[in-house]
């Protein structure tokens, strides 16, 4: 194996720590970088970047590598957070982690690493990279641990980025990663995995969003136009949402609910839960339906835009598989058309709560082909 100078993104978590250890064990020259992507609020009790850096520094000390603290907060605000706010203001539900990977971790961080003389970068993502011997193209593969696979969040990476990237823990299961961390005495071996959006931390999402987006309360209507309550602002809701609707105690209003066809809704009735089905920006109305299988929650087709293809070109029309949300099982689909930065997918089985703003990511078996942002859905 050729030895490289590798710059590892050390987050303070166990996955990136084991990544650095494995690479050093393989004989590479390893340097760690801690990326600060969000400026802590002066009085915030939620942001943990200071502690994360201390954890990363402790890891670097145990492994025996240098670590540098680099601030990418300005780049993050311009390239990721601004788009995040625009999408919410437009009534969509964005996925900032996808954009963060493409613009910060594999662009700003990669550029910085190259200036340091790195030949490769590495992160603790659960994914794999290989070079196809027939085409010479680099491919992004799912991580071997299906419960931790993060290829969905990496689908916007291009050939140049993948050619410089290593994902050592993508070849392992999470249990193996924690075992390795414990065996070599890493101080963060039992550290809890990070969850949620990095710049929000553990604070309530509604509280955070309320600081940046103007909102207007409005009516909550069911599929027959009956008023069930008031929402606090459309930006605070997403399709398929069940919790936090504030319409408990109105179960009798859904009894006998029917689909637009006039047929009773399966699962609707006195005790069926309510779900967000539509956000009508023109009238500032939140539409909810009762029952998990309500037709308004199901769709067979989606249109996507702002597509990015790992091979540099869209896949041919035909059979494929796709995810429309993280941790979803691959769903069989047909690529109806894929031209430029737009594509259309048709699903033989109805998909539940497909959400504009989220990513539709295509797969050919274990190979991630790329994807785009869901723009519209159709029944």
UniProtKB/Swiss-Prot annotation:
User: Which InterPro entries does the record match to this protein?
Assistant: MnmA-like (IPR004506), MnmA-like_C (IPR046885), MnmA-like_central (IPR046884), MnmA-like_central_sf (IPR023382), Rossmann-like_a/b/a_fold (IPR014729)
Interaction with tRNA as annotated region, ranges: 148-150, 325-326
Give this protein's Gene Ontology molecular function annotations: ATP binding; tRNA binding; tRNA-uridine 2-sulfurtransferase activity
Protein's GO biological process: tRNA wobble position uridine thiolation
Q: Which GO terms describe its cellular component?
A: cytoplasm
Gene3D superfamilies per the UniProt record, alphabetical: Adenine nucleotide alpha hydrolases-like domains, HUPs, Translation factors
Q: Which SUPFAM superfamilies match?
A: Adenine nucleotide alpha hydrolases-like
Q: Which reaction does it catalyse?
A: S-sulfanyl-L-cysteinyl-[protein] + uridine(34) in tRNA + AH2 + ATP = 2-thiouridine(34) in tRNA + L-cysteinyl-[protein] + A + AMP + diphosphate + H(+)
Give the top-level enzyme category.
transferase
Where are the residues of the annotated region Interaction with target base in tRNA? 95-97
Where found? Cytoplasm
Q: Where is this site: Interaction with tRNA?
A: 125, 358
Q: Which cysteines are joined by disulfide bonds?
A: 100-198
Q: Please list the residues that make up the active site.
A: 100, 198
Which keywords does UniProt give here?
A: ATP-binding, Cytoplasm, Disulfide bond, Nucleotide-binding, RNA-binding, Transferase, tRNA processing, tRNA-binding
State the superkingdom.
Answer: Bacteria
Q: What is its EC number?
A: 2.8.1.13
Protein residues bound to ATP: 9-16, 35, 124
Give the record's family classification: Belongs to the MnmA/TRMU family.
Function statement: Catalyzes the 2-thiolation of uridine at the wobble position (U34) of tRNA, leading to the formation of s(2)U34.
- The protein in question is named tRNA-specific 2-thiouridylase MnmA
């Amino acid at each position: 194996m050729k030895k490289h100078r590798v710059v590892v993104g050390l987050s303070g978590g166990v996955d990136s720590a084991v990544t650095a250890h494995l690479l050093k064990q393989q004989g590479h020259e390893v340097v760690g970088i801690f990326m600060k992507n969000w400026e802590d609020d002066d009085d915030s009790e939620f942001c943990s970047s200071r502690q994360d850096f201390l954890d990363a520094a402790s890891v670097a000390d145990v492994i025996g590598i240098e670590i540098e603290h680099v601030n990418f907060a300005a780049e993050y605000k311009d390239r990721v957070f601004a788009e995040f706010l625009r999408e919410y203001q437009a009534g969509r539900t964005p996925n900032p982690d996808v954009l963060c990977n493409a613009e910060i971790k594999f662009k700003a961080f990669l550029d910085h690493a190259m200036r340091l003389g790195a030949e490769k970068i590495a992160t603790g993502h659960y994914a794999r990279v290989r070079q196809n011997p027939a085409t010479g193209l680099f491919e992004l593969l799912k991580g071997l641990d299906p419960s931790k696979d993060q290829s969905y969040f990496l689908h916007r990476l291009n050939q140049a980025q993948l050619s410089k990237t290593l994902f050592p823990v993508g070849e392992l299961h999470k249990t193996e990663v924690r075992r390795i961390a414990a065996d070599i005495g890493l101080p963060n071996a039992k550290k809890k995995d990070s969850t949620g959006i990095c710049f929000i931390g553990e604070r309530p999402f509604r509280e955070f969003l309320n600081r940046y987006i103007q909102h207007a309360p409005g009516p909550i209507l069911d599929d027959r136009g009956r008023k069930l309550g008031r929402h606090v602002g459309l930006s605070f809701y997403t399709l398929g949402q069940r919790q936090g609707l504030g319409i408990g105690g109105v179960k009798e209003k859904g009894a006998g609910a029917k689909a637009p066809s006039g047929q009773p809704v399966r699962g609707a009735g006195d005790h069926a839960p309510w779900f967000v089905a539509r956000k009508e920006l023109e009238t500032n109305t939140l539409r909810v339906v009762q029952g998990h299988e309500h037709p308004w929650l199901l769709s067979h087709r989606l249109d996507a835009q702002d597509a990015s293809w790992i091979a540099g070109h869209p896949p041919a029309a035909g059979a494929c598989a796709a995810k429309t949300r993280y941790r979803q099982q691959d769903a069989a689909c047909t690529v109806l058309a894929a031209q430029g930065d737009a594509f259309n997918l048709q699903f033989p089985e109805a998909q539940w709560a497909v959400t504009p703003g989220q990513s539709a990511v295509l797969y050919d078996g274990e190979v991630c082909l790329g994807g785009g942002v869901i723009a519209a859905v159709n029944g």
